[in-house]
Amino acid sequence: MSGMYQDLTGPEILTELTEESIVLLPIGAIEQHGPHLPLSVDYVIADEMARAVLEKCGKEIDLWVLPTLSFSKSNEHSWSPGTISLEYKTLMAVLNDIALSVSNKKKKKI
């Protein structure tokens, strides 16, 4: 079985996800893409790509997609209004915490 991680209940996490499960974390920044595009371009692409991968591969592999992380390291765009950026250490700490939370549920492939 495959699907969206956040659609499972707590008890389902223990029964549906196994050590063979692959958990995908899409990451898309909130940053400028010029005056003609919204700040969410990277987020939308990452979210839709993850859903497409799930649709295409979810019957062949045990794949679970986490909610898309909408913040990343975007300090190169800090000059632009609206950009939200995490420091490298902060982003790595967030990714580590997410991985530990997921792998704590006996899932190893993130």
Where are these regions (language model features)?
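Acidic/His-rich segments in extracytoplasmic proteins that coordinate ligands and/or metal ions
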Residues: 110
